[in-house]
Amino acid sequence: MTIRILCDFDGTVTEHDNIIALMTEFAPPEAFEPLKKGVLDQSLSIQSGVGQMFRLLPSDRKQDYIDFLEQRAVIRPGFKTLLAFAKSNGIDFAIVSGGIDFFVQPILQELLTDEAIYCNGSDFSGETIRIEWPHTCDAACNNQCGCCKTSIARKLKQDGDIIVTIGDSVTDFELAKQADHVYARDYLITLCEQHGIAYTPFETFYDIVDHLQTTEVYA
């Protein structure tokens, strides 16, 4: 049996959502805001919404985007402690993110290998950014997730494994419905309460480490 922690990135590992920050800074608000609303109220699939958002951004400003996000990204307190706790206790840890490789990987490069990061890809060869989807939905999911967290969980899970998810928003909801234990903050708490999904609230990763150390969450 392996305990597998599948952790969101934007708004979870980082204190703010990097896609929202990037779009707010660089995208035309009259085009971005309806897409944001559609994704959040689930009238627009994540894959469609995120794909359309990035088509609003010119490819030739790639370094500006990277510099902007690296300068403002704040890692939520306790993340290194959680990684160390997972390593010392034989817990498998992976990032499952609806974010994009060109900013997720640089922000995490000193903390995790790329092999432990599941996220969307990017193509800057055209006039605007085209998002690539290496982790699309499997046959068991038809939600057009983009980076399908439930499909990744099914791919990784072996018989007897325990899936723990950590997240903050609508992109974490489908996995929260299937995980053995959920750590939630912000909008994911609202969704869990609306649908009767058990969860443990957190604000920092120290909260999660404390809970893992003191509670039999895997029973």
UniProtKB/Swiss-Prot annotation:
Transmembrane segments: none annotated. GO terms for biological process: L-methionine salvage from methylthioadenosine; L-serine biosynthetic process. The keyword Ion transport does not apply. It is an enzyme of class 3 (hydrolase). Its EC number is 3.1.3.87. Pathway: Amino-acid biosynthesis; L-methionine biosynthesis via salvage pathway; L-methionine from S-methyl-5-thio-alpha-D-ribose 1-phosphate: step 4/6. It catalyses: 2-hydroxy-5-methylsulfanyl-3-oxopent-1-enyl phosphate + H2O = 1,2-dihydroxy-5-(methylsulfanyl)pent-1-en-3-one + phosphate. NCBIfam families: DKMTPPase-SF (TIGR01489), HAD-SF-IB (TIGR01488), PRK09552.1 (NF007103). This is 2-hydroxy-3-keto-5-methylthiopentenyl-1-phosphate phosphatase. The lineage of its organism: Bacteria, Bacillati, Bacillota, Bacilli, Bacillales.
